[in-house]
């Protein structure tokens, strides 16, 4: 069962830091309405100032702002992190958007891909399944036209945790014309060619992606591996022509992971990703991929990550 969506009433009052509201709009690529959770910085309604924007992903739009998402976060959310960074002067003001890349009940991950088999589920909120089009066209255009963003790639970032971290990196590699700054905490990154180097089984053996039922709506059953490679950041990177590679290299990437693998984290996937980044001359803004020596795959550590990555996004926006 998905956690209840709890945004305390005081979060809606703009005089206590930024305001958080749940919004929806009609997404033409999906043929349905989609919700998003919006953070507007303190004073937004009192000025005509424009702001950079960062899109935050996990699955459901509530997750980065839901005080009850898991017990580890102790009521602390992305709103608290952003308010404190802005108040301390470590970042300037930004608009933050928690977006939906899943069904309404969060049972079907949509991943920011144009799904192969969206009609295989009855879950509400999937629509046509064209989630890449939804993110790159509908959502960005809606946010830029509805709120006072700075509507430029130079002032737009994307970030995520777990599957949201995978999606953020995939978007940064596949659409470097849309984002200048990309972050990921403990992303469920794909192995290159879906070849999990930790074992010597018949390919493809990236079992998380090619065998679990979780992704059959997105990528078919059996999996269409050739299609999946179009959404594998490492395959995209290794096959990128020189001009596209230069665009990707212009993106600033901020990759961190939990300190463990298996059921505690995805550090080996992050290390694999960064090995290929290094081969292509792409730098990680963090020198150590571990968030902390004991970091876990939970919302407490995702909040700690956000404290670091929001500063990285702000630095990226300030350079351009």
Locations of regions flagged by a protein language model:
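Non-catalytic cap/lid and distal C-terminal segments of serine-dependent acyl enzymes
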Residues: 3-320
């Amino acid at each position: 069962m998905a956690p209840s969506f709890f945004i305390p009433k005081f979060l809606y009052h703009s005089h206590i830091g930024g305001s958080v509201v749940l919004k929806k709009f009609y997404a033409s690529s999906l043929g349905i309405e989609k919700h998003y959770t919006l953070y507007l910085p303190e004073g937004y309604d009192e000025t005509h100032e424009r702001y950079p924007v960062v899109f935050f992903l996990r699955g459901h739009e509530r997750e980065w702002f839901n005080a009850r998402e898991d017990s580890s976060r102790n009521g602390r959310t992305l709103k608290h992190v952003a308010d404190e960074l802005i108040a301390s002067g470590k970042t300037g003001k930004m608009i933050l958007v928690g977006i939906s890349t899943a069904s309404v009940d969060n049972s079907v991950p949509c991943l920011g891909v144009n799904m192969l088999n969206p009609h295989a589920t009855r879950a509400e909120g999937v629509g046509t399944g064209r989630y890449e089009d939804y993110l790159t066209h509908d959502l960005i255009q809606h946010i830029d036209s509805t709120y006072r963003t700075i509507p430029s790639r130079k002032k737009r970032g994307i970030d995520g945790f777990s599957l949201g971290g995978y999606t953020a990196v995939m978007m940064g590699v596949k659409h470097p014309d849309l984002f200048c700054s990309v972050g990921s905490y403990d992303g469920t990154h794909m192995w290159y060619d879906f070849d999990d180097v930790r074992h010597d089984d018949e390919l493809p053996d990236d079992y998380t992606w090619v065998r679990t039922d979780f992704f059959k709506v997105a990528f078919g059953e059996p999996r269409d591996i050739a299609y999946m490679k179009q959404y594998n950041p490492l395959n995209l990177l290794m096959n990128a022509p020189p001009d596209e590679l230069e665009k990707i290299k212009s993106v600033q990437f901020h990759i961190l992971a939990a300190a463990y693998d298996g059921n505690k984290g995805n550090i080996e996937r992050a290390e694999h990703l960064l090995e290929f980044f290094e081969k292509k001359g792409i730098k990680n803004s963090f020198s150590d991929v571990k968030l902390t020596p004991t970091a876990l795959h939970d919302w407490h550590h995702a909040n700690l990550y956000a404290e670091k990555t929001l500063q990285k996004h702000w630095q990226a926006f300030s350079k351009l």
